[in-house]
Regions:
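Aromatic-Pro/Gly-enriched surface loop or interdomain linker
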Residues: 1-25, 210-211, 216-222
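Acidic (Asp/Glu)-rich catalytic clusters
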Residues: 19-21, 48-52, 168-171
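A glycine-rich, often tryptophan-bearing local segment used as a flexible ligand/cofactor-contacting loop or short
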Residues: 35-115
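Oxidoreductase and adenylate-handling cofactor-binding alpha/beta cores
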Residues: 81-90, 119-123, 130-135, 196-211
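Catalytic beta-strand/loop cores that center a nucleophilic Ser/Cys/Thr
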Residues: 90-91, 95-174
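Extracellular ligand-binding/catalytic regions of CAZymes and related secreted enzymes
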Residues: 145-222
């Protein structure tokens, strides 16, 4: 595991600077929050692993990492600021307030979510969807924000938002398996057995060790 103690959004992992850094990895879990890392050469060396067939599991803030230029707008395929989003399979640029998210699994036949029950999180961040870049939806989230009145009496009306919150993608010439979920801002969510089951299944799927019934292949589960 590579850990960077940076508390901001500029974590730099020395391992990512090395040629062939990924040669001994079966899968890479991206759980970094690197929104202000904007060096294309550094990012391309990360992406090289996935172009060459190493699967990825992307969690929460990984979706808002390695972005620059006019990333708030839909990126154009092939541009240097599009490559990270192309690996993810979906472009997201921001989120709303922390409120519970009602998660509904949409692809009932995917082994990643087969048999999983819909559930509602504790307060979480619902990441927006700017555009889909190959993602295959597994789950969507609905977040309702209640009416709010500030100290001056100004009222912000109640609202609701929908977004894809879990998906798969096939990336690059080798159609590398990619699993991503935007859920997971708070520890209470990450500790939830339902969240852990989803991520574990996504990881097993990415490395080809998840059976059609949603159970781990022999030797890869409890």
């Amino acid at each position: 595991m590579a850990y960077d103690a940076t508390k901001g959004t500029k974590p730099v992992f020395e391992i990512y600077k090395k040629d062939g850094w990924y040669k001994d990895f079966d899968v890479v879990v991206h759980d970094e929050c690197a929104a202000d890392i904007t060096d294309p050469t550094y990012v391309e060396n990360i992406l090289k692993a996935h172009r060459e067939g190493v699967p990825a599991v992307n969690l929460h803030c990984a979706m808002h990492s390695y972005r620059w230029g006019k990333f708030q707008q839909p990126v154009k395929a092939g541009d240097d600021n599009a490559h990270w989003y192309e690996m993810l399979g979906l472009q997201s640029t921001g989120h709303g307030p922390q409120q519970p998210i009602a998660i509904a699994f949409t692809d009932k036949e995917s082994p990643i979510v087969k048999g999983l029950a819909d559930w509602t999180t504790v307060n979480e961040e619902l990441y927006n969807n700017v555009q889909i870049l190959g993602a295959k939806t597994l789950a969507k989230g609905l977040q309702k924000v209640p009416e709010k009145k500030d100290k001056k009496g100004k009222v912000t009306p109640a609202s609701e938002a929908n977004a894809i919150v879990a998906w798969t993608n096939e990336f690059g010439p080798k159609k590398t398996r990619i699993f991503s979920t935007t859920i997971g801002h708070n520890n209470a969510t990450v500790e939830d057995a339902r969240y852990l089951d989803l991520v574990a299944r996504g990881l097993l799927w990415s490395v080809g060790k998840l059976e059609a019934d949603g159970k781990a292949s022999a030797g890869f589960g409890k």
